């Protein structure tokens, strides 16, 4: 680029497929399959199946392969190490959302503003993921899933204690406990806080692969068993079962009822909204999120060096 050519100020532009960097030849967290996807984390709404290449952290690559198959083409980047794509340099930095989740830092080779895309993020303490790291930048694109003042999370340890108390009460009455939550990240955060002294812990098949990846990364989790026909008797009454929301009301879940039936719960930040528990049709709602709440988002913005924030909703 000649010295008379203006330096582009918009390294990233929104398109139908997602945020696109023309100078780097990649999308960030595309909505549909693309040739090269720089992927902040392994949730399917950020890492759609079918991309020719995923550029991500090693732990995100492990999670993607556990979900989509070992043949997935993943180019892995270590924390803070710069990699050139076309006319830009890219590096990844911990986002605190789930294990391996990354913020994406982008800088043009010929100068101009530094951009950071947080992806989903949080700044809470979480033993199952790398701690959030602030990255100096000029333009900050930050997620805002819970970007309203109504969203305030209780301390995660308080919520996990409530879940254990609920489970123990149910077990004493020979009533099976079922907690629905998302299979990657949230489920492992929940598992890390469960007390195995109360009873056996069963997990849905969709959680088995991701949970094994977490264990391989030396994340401390209690012993679990795969919840199925062969383990139903062991789990009935005393056990707790962690499963995705798609298992609600299925014959699979009904087989685990104890002598006094079962109680169901949903663990999510959305449980902070009145009516969500009824909408989900569960007995209990526990406010446990892998996203920053309103104050968390404000705190994250304040950590940056005078950025120009852009809200991704």
Residues covered by each model-derived region:
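A C-terminal functional module that forms or caps the active site or interfaces directly
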Residues: 266-294
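Short internal beta-strands
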Residues: 53-59, 200-209, 310
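A short, acidic, amphipathic alpha-helical segment used as a generic capping/interface helix at domain edges
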Residues: 163, 248-256, 289-303
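His/Asp/Glu-rich metal-coordinating catalytic cores
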Residues: 5-32, 36, 42-180, 185
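Structural motif
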Residues: 31, 181-182, 242-248, 267-270, ...
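Hard-cation-handling environments
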Residues: 163-177, 181-188, 192-235
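Conserved small/polar residues in nucleotide/adenosyl-binding loops
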Residues: 304-311
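A contiguous, basic/glycine-rich beta-loop/short-helix subdomain that forms a polymer-engagement track
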Residues: 212-264
């Amino acid at each position: 680029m000649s010295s008379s050519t203006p330096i582009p100020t918009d390294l990233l532009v929104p398109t139908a497929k997602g945020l696109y960097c023309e100078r780097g030849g990649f999308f960030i967290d595309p909505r549909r399959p693309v040739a090269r996807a720089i992927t902040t984390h392994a949730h399917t709404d950020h890492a759609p199946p079918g991309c020719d290449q995923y550029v991500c952290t090693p732990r995100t690559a492990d999670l993607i392969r556990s979900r989509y198959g070992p043949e997935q083409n993943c180019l892995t980047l270590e924390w803070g190490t710069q990699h050139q794509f076309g006319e830009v340099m890219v590096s990844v930095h911990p986002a605190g959302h789930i294990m391996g989740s990354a913020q994406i830092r982008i800088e043009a080779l010929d100068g101009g503003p530094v951009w950071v895309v947080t992806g989903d993020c949080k700044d809470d303490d979480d033993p199952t993921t790398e701690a959030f790291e602030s990255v100096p930048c000029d333009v900050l694109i930050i997620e805002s899933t819970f970007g309203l003042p109504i969203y305030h999370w209780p301390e995660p340890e308080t919520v996990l204690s409530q879940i254990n108390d609920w489970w123990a009460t149910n077990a004493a009455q020979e009533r099976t406990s079922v907690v629905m939550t998302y299979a990657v990240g949230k489920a492992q955060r929940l598992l890390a806080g469960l007390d195995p002294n109360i009873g056996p812990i069963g997990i849905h098949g969709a959680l088995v692969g991701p949970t094994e990846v977490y264990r391989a990364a030396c994340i401390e989790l209690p012993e679990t068993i795969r919840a199925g026909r062969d383990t139903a008797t062991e789990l009935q009454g005393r056990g707790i079962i962690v499963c995705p929301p798609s298992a609600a009301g299925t014959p699979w879940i009904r087989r685990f009822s104890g002598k006094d039936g079962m109680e169901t719960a949903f663990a999510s930040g959305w449980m902070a909204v009145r009516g969500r528990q009824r909408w989900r049709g569960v007995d209990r709602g526990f406010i446990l999120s892998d996203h920053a709440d309103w104050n968390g988002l404000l705190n994250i913005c304040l950590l940056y060096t005078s950025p120009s924030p852009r809200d991704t909703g």
